[in-house]
Amino acid sequence: MLNSRWFNMLTENELNALITKADQSDVKAMIKLAEYYRSINELDKAFKYVHKSTLYSYPEGERKLGYYYEKGIGCDKDLVKARQYYELAAMHGDIKAKYNIGLFYYKNNQYPQAFNYVKDAADNGYGKACALLGYFYEHAIGAAQSFELARESYLKALEQGEKGLYHRLGILSYYGNGVPQNIDEAFNYFYQGANEEEKECYYYLGVMYSKGEGVKKDYSKAFYWYQQGANSGDVKAMYNVAIYYENGIYVPKDLEKAKYWLKKSAAGGFDLAINKIQIDNI
């Protein structure tokens, strides 16, 4: 039995059978071998089999080879070749490649090209592309800003099983961006996200419990969610935890803890915390 995280039941005979199939031009076997060798960190062999699959114009192999070149897996990093193979796979109809090259262009600040590729992938039902397209619409990246289209794209992404989108939908509903403001709906989105450990939702739940928005006012629950957010690295939540300790809201007044969280928030770049430290000479 081989030590493999990917094929945890792969035997020597099964490995040899895959190698034989790959030698007989079976491109799916080549990709399986590449994934296997990558899982055991034999990256030269992984690269070899991914590259071999592209000789047969196999779109999945072309996309994966683009990724290998982009990340330098089993080869020197080469962004020119990465883009070439992503484009080749996209030309051969690989939807994920269209998303990958869109993401590639986005990282390189080529926003119109990024938008076009991501939208193409999203229009073909790829969930990750739907999520990114929503972000593009929300923030006017490569296209005119449209909160309504952002919301539609986020909902499509959720339907495809994508995670990490409840805070985006919650924010749109909370502020009335693209839809009439709906505080109850916003609370439900944030709560769903928090239940899936979507850390961006913790702060907003704290705000809504502290103000009684969409739910009965409850400082104990507000503090709980602020603390969850602070523990997850949210500088706004850290600031509010500091304020609660400073003023004894729900928790006993504790100036040392207040200073601790205030300084952490300021270190994270939160302006209110930075200003408060300067004003209070902390």
Which residue ranges define each predicted feature?
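N-terminal segments that cap or nucleate solenoid repeat domains
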Residues: L2-I40, E60
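Ankyrin-repeat and related helical/solenoid repeat scaffolds used for protein-protein interactions
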Residues: Y202-K211, K216-L272
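Terminal, low-structured helical/coil segments at or just beyond the last alpha-helical repeat
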Residues: L2, W6-L10, K264-I282
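Hydrophobic face of amphipathic alpha-helices that form TPR/SEL1-like repeat modules
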Residues: M30-I40, E62-K71, C75, K98-K107, ...
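Short helix-capping/linker turns of helical repeat alpha-solenoids
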Residues: Q24-D26, Y56-P59, K71-I73, M91-D94, ...
